[in-house]
């Protein structure tokens, strides 16, 4: 079949260590290939499920060769491959094979119908921002990473509170004693930040949210900053303080270290089915608009 879509090569990425994922991945590959698209697999995914019929590529090779990546997994899978493909601006399509699925929005039961439609051009596109962070020690950068959801400075499970000196654009904001601080993108506002009583930011809102984790002072509240802000967090006191990036990679910190966080120049293009609504996602995932029936109200 002749392909007339803007997409020619489609990469498939699967959630690692997931029993039963081989069947839907290979079925989707066959479905896409029959429509004339070239199909490639992410190398770790191919090795895990034993795929040999399609090329197996590393993320950098996918970025250079594929026109779109279809991700079958949970939000964590999407975050991981999204960070790696962001420099290549490879669009992502997410199929939910996890639990919550805020950014993998296509039900696995509908993938064979919806994904081919999207590859044929029937989709809605949006750009999701990333954060970039670097750790400064003694005035020198020692670590650098991207984050799709959030950069989290926090204490380990058995240590006391950490004291953090926080400034924005070089201006002192506050000293905070807490279990940590979350710096989140709008995408990340529905992740760890939400469970720490942070606000939900619409994905198209240009902002960065700071959310304290169990602060000592109840007056320490979340705050939304302009997305061109530079946030600096210095470790004043505390034992075993770490910084996590999307809760998928981390590094240990020392007293005096400073974490500098700002919006990355990279964005992640995400494709959704026609009719996609962020508010529908919130209703479904957070169980909004669900009220007990009158019968339930009348039960003793």
From Swiss-Prot:
GO terms for biological process: NAD metabolic process; NADP biosynthetic process. It comes from the Bacteria. Disulfide bonds: none annotated. Its cofactor is a divalent metal cation. It catalyses: NAD(+) + ATP = ADP + NADP(+) + H(+). The active site is at 75 (proton acceptor). It is found in: Cytoplasm. Keywords: ATP-binding, Cytoplasm, Kinase, NAD, NADP, Nucleotide-binding, Transferase. One of its GO terms (cellular component) is cytoplasm. InterPro entries: ATP-NAD_kinase_N, ATP-NAD_kinase_PpnK-typ_C, NAD/diacylglycerol_kinase_sf, NADK. Its EC number is 2.7.1.23. Involved in the regulation of the intracellular balance of NAD and NADP, and is a key enzyme in the biosynthesis of NADP. Catalyzes specifically the phosphorylation on 2'-hydroxyl of the adenosine moiety of NAD to yield NADP. HAMAP family: NAD_kinase (MF_00361). PANTHER family: NAD KINASE. NCBIfam families: PRK02155.1. Belongs to the NAD kinase family. This is NAD kinase.
């Amino acid at each position: 079949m002749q392909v007339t879509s803007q997409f020619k090569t489609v990469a498939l990425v699967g959630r690692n260590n997931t029993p039963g994922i081989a069947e839907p991945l290979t079925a989707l590959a066959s479905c896409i290939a029959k429509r004339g698209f070239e199909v490639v697999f992410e190398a770790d995914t191919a090795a895990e499920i034993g795929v040999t019929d399609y090329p197996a590529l590393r993320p950098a090779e996918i970025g250079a060769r594929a026109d779109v990546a279809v991700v079958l997994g949970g939000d964590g899978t999407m975050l991981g491959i999204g960070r790696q493909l962001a420099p290549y601006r490879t669009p992502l399509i997410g199929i939910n094979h996890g639990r919550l699925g805020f950014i993998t929005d296509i039900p696995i039961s509908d993938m064979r119908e919806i994904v081919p439609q999207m590859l044929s051009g029937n989709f809605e596109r949006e750009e999701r921002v990333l954060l970039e962070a670097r750790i400064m020690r003694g005035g020198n950068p020692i670590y650098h990473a991207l984050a799709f959801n959030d950069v989290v400075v926090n204490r380990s499970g058995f240590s006391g509170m950490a004291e953090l000196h926080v400034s924005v654009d070089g201006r002192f904001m506050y000293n905070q004693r807490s279990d940590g601080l979350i710096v989140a993108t709008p995408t990340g506002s529905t992740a760890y930040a939400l469970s720490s009583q942070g606000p939900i930011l619409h994905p198209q809102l240009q902002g960065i949210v700071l959310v304290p984790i169990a602060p000592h002072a109840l007056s320490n509240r979340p705050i939304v900053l302009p997305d061109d802000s530079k946030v600096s967090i210095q470790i004043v006191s505390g034992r075993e303080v770490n910084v996590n990036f999307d809760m998928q990679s981390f590094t240990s910190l020392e007293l005096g270290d400073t974490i500098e966080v700002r919006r990355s120049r990279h964005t992640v293009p995400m494709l959704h089915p026609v009719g996609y609504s962020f508010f529908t996602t919130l209703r479904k995932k957070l169980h909004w608009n669900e009220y007990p029936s009158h019968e339930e109200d009348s039960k003793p």
